[in-house]
Amino acid sequence: MLMMFKDILRTLIFTLVPGLIFAFLVMSALPTFKKSGFKNTIKGFFKSLKNKDHLFLFLLLIYFFIVIYRTLFQRDFSYDSLSDVFGGWKIFKTQYTGLDYQVIGNIAMFFPFGLLWTLTFEREEKSVKTLLITLLSSLCFSAFIEITQLIFSKGTFQFSDIVYNTLGGVLGAVIFII
């Protein structure tokens, strides 16, 4: 009985948020489909992607989906999400194993965020302000992921992940500015 309850709970955790997102998207698009028809709505969508603002926003939304899926839905349940809160700072594991791919992965995962964020929202201004806004946005998105992982017991909460993710976002913005 307990096993069945855990299975039902796990199914809800894995499917509730994607289901809510899917339902929201369908309900948001429904009035347009009813008014213009499916074919005209699809044509209008692809036509809107010719506008750079729409294209970059579309790519940013795809990026958000991929990162959220990878960090929240593709993880196993963790019984102790707070087991290594202050771990993960070392860039090198040992002299024999080389680089820690988790650190590089965290930086690389947020690099597109910084680039797409600046292309979408800060394209007109290439300045320190752009870097600060991207830093804050990267920090907030990374903290959202880590806190959500903690709430739903997905992976382990680590401050180093937030720092390295934020660094990746800032590096993406630096490439935009250069």
Language-model-detected regions and their locations in the chain:
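Bulky hydrophobic segments
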Residues: 1-154, 159, 173-178
